[in-house]
């Protein structure tokens, strides 16, 4: 069972709901160029997938797409808490940043506002106590890509055939890897691999990682929940992004995660930096 461990040493668990809750999935469309607003350097060609998986009874992931934002929120909490948290993060981020000029300050402020709103919500409704969500979002800003990150969903960048993880997991085992106490291989099977040290909404304040990376023509970006990266290695993801087009890569990533057990909800967004004269696949 999945656990979320926050900085006050409270443990919130990612439960299966006792009663199935219907959650509409984002419509799966062919990838199309999406405008990124007034600071646009080039359009992104985007496709996304989300699936409940083979074990859980409902989907607590939320795909964020709109207002120039691309992201994943992976909710946690019993009853409807996980869905409430991830959906609240999605709607809160879209509302907070609608029409705003992209900046690191605006992104950090939006995440803080969402965190406060979710925290207040569970104070008002004790049935939501312990809810929270990961949050990893991309926000194009001219020739830069802004990234906001809390938790263990991930953002990757594929450039010149090499895939690298650009966010750092806020998890117990990731901290142990960074301190040299575990190898990445050991971390992948460690019994505490599903404990995270930061989540949106579990405390009155939040410290988000805010990154700014250069955008280059032909770059590919991947944002995904742990339901994907927990079952597919970096090498798996890199191979699919290099050898197949955007749509095929998304389909194959989802298929492989399901074939390997689909233990959690699976969500991903793939985006490619458009090049002159390029059309959607």
Where do the protein language model's features map onto the residues?
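PP2C/PPM-type serine/threonine phosphatase catalytic domain
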Residues: 1-281
């Amino acid at each position: 069972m999945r656990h979320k461990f926050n900085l006050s040493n409270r443990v919130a668990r990612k439960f299966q709901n006792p009663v199935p809750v219907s959650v509409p999935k984002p419509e799966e469309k062919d990838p199309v160029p999406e405008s990124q607003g007034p600071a646009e350097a080039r359009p992104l060609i985007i496709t996304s997938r989300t699936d409940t998986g083979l074990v859980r009874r409902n989907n607590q992931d939320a795909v964020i797409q709109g207002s120039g934002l691309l992201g994943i929120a992976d909710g946690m909490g019993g009853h409807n808490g996980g869905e409430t948290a991830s959906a609240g993060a999605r709607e809160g981020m879209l509302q907070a940043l609608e029409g705003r000029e992209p900046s690191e300050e605006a992104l950090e402020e939006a995440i803080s506002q969402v965190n406060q709103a979710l925290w207040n919500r569970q104070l008002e409704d004790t049935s939501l106590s312990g809810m929270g969500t990961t949050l990893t979002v991309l926000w194009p800003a001219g020739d830069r890509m802004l990234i906001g990150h809390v938790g263990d969903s991930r953002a990757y960048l594929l450039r010149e055939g090499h895939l690298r993880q650009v966010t750092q997991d806020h998890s117990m085992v990731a901290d142990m890897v960074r301190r040299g106490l575990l190898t990445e291989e050991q971390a992948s099977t460690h019994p505490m691999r599903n404990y995270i040290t930061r989540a949106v909404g579990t405390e009155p304040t939040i410290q988000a990682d805010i990154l700014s990376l250069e955008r280059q023509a032909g770059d590919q970006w991947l944002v995904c929940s742990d339901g994907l990266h927990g079952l597919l290695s970096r090498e798996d993801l890199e191979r699919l992004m290099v050898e197949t087009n955007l749509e095929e890569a998304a389909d194959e990533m989802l298929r492989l995660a399901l074939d390997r057990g689909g233990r959690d909800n699976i969500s991903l967004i793939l985006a490619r930096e458009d090049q002159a004269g390029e059309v959607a696949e």
